Amino acid sequence: MLFIDNPTVEKVLSMDECIDAQDIAFRGLPTGASVHRPRIDVYVPTDRTDGYFRWGTMEGASKDLGVFAIRMKSDILYWPQDEQGFWKEEKYNTEPGLYCGLVMLFSTRNGAPLAIINDGIIQHMRVGGGAGLGAKYLSRPDSHTVGMIGSGGMARTYLQAFCSVRDIRHVKVYSPTKKNREAYAAEMAGKLEIDVQPVNTPEEAVDGADIVAAATNAMQAALKGAWLQPGQHVTDVRGELDDDVFTRADVIFRQGVAHSRPRNEDVEHMGDGFNNGDYIAGNAEELERLPKRHRSAGVGAAPKAYPSFNDLASGNFPLRTSADQVTLYLNSGNQGLQFAAVGAAVYNRCLELGLGHQLPTEWFLQDIRD
């Protein structure tokens, strides 16, 4: 069994491989070769008077890859507001700047535990890879420009993914903090050898772009449909789109089902917090800590409100049919399967290269029936 840390993941995982692994695994969903359980979060009041503890899990498996994965994360959450009253989610584990997220990989052939993987790099890469899949199938083949709203980790892997599937030459990036967007522009221009310019408004980032991405930690709409122009392809991270985006879009696909929906009788506070169907503990005073999140037309919608990647792979729904259409890819869903596909790619590459920290498999086995 291997323990694989983030520096090792970064060394062995390319964006091209990340996109291809997901594409193959997702195409197993309509045939029954792949399966996943959507994300479930459990919230418990914590000692912070403005925060909550959150435990999150998601699972997925691929018969063809022979792997099952569970991703687990333990966070202390709090939600500061800016001068305009907009919420932003912040989190940590133990102390600010530290995080705890793990992917456990198991063999579906004999059940053996295969690996424990730090989830930091995989998390950003699998989400960026999903956005790349959407751009691969829905953006115009002649797309050369990107309008990026956001300058964090997701904005970095999103741009990597767009460059993997399209000949990207020019990028405009906006985020509220000037030094952050300037740092992003300098870093990504050097890394990808393309022109990246920071701009002063989100509208300026969107104007004239072929691919538009909202890659933020905002809990309200960061991208407005009024800014969109014919022919653009649009994607998101967490539903930070206003309802007009959905009105403007001619073609909409969702990646998959993002969150499980418990029965109402199982969840007293269904719809509070980040997702519909979270399991939330707390008394009336503690529940007041939770933010009131913007919910766009694609957030909290019925799982079958829009065609999914299953439909895309099966050819059941048309993709872009003209250069003037606005296309939208809701980049959430199938998370557990993403971790299985990308985790397997990382694990197999580590075996080939002799990387990772060896752990005795017998530590994780027992002779008492479970």
Question: Over which residues does each language-model region extend?
Answer:
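Adenosine-phosphate binding glycine-rich loop
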Residues: 6-10, 246-370
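Short helix-loop-beta connector
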Residues: 139-145, 167, 229-230
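Glycine-rich Rossmann-fold phosphate-binding loop(s) that bind the pyrophosphate
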Residues: 151-152
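NAD(P)-binding Rossmann-fold cofactor-contacting core
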Residues: 165-192
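Rossmann-like adenosine-cofactor binding region
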Residues: 193-287
